[in-house]
Amino acid sequence: MKIDPQISIFVNGNSHLYQLRGVIYFGGQHFVARLVEQDSTVWYHDGIITGRNMIYEGQLESVDLKHCCDGKTPSALFYTRILHQS
């Protein structure tokens, strides 16, 4: 699976740009997540291990989003639309 940091979707002939904001992983009957901030900072969350806290993992370009702890695989990707200011 290829995970793009940005995707473009065409609606009625107009291109809309979306930026990756999160990846949900599943494996071993358990979900974990990575969250991506607007500045491309990546955080890891596992409610069982980290509780309410997140662990800093680095900048988006240096984190392998296709693989996660204990062999968990990506199950869902979340993107938000980038609104252009005029």
Where are the model-predicted features located?
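Disordered, polybasic Ser/Thr-rich segments at the N-terminal boundary of pleckstrin homology
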Residues: 1-15
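Conserved catalytic-core surface of thiol
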Residues: 13-86
